[in-house]
Amino acid sequence: MAQHEITRCQAMILQYMQKVITTYEHNYAIGRRLDMSPSAVRGAIIRLIKLKLITEKDDEGQRLLEITKLGKKHMIILDEIKKSRWT
C-alpha cells in the first residue's frame, strides 16, 4: 500500500472524524472546534477525500462527511508527526 504523508491540519481533522464518525458541520464550525481557518479545513478535507480516508456525500442538500474504514484504521498521533518533521 502506498504511504502518504499528511499535514498537521489533515491529522487534526482525521482525529476529529475518528471521534464523531459522521458530521454535517460546515468548514467554519469544524475550524472553530479545531482552531483552524475554514479554508485550511476545506483544503485538508479535499486531501483526505483524495486519500480515501473520509467521504463527502450530499444528504438532502447538506454536506455529510463520513470516515471510511481505512480512515478508522489509520491511527495518527500528532506528537509522532511533529517529531518526524523536526528531527
Residue ranges, per PLM feature:
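Short acidic, hydrophobic short linear motifs in intrinsically disordered regions
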Residues: 22-33
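Short, hydrophobic-biased segments on the C-terminal half of alpha helices
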Residues: 45-46
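Short alpha-helical segments that sit at the start of domains
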Residues: 1-13
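Glycine-centered, phosphate/nucleic-acid-interacting loop/turn motifs that mediate DNA/RNA or nucleotide
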Residues: 52
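Key DNA-contact positions within bacterial/archaeal DNA-binding proteins
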Residues: 39
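Short, locally clustered residues in the helix-turn-helix/winged-helix DNA-binding domain
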Residues: 15-22, 79
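Short, Lys/Arg-rich nucleic-acid/phosphate-binding segment
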Residues: 58-65
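Amphipathic alpha-helical dimerization/coiled-coil segments
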Residues: 73-87
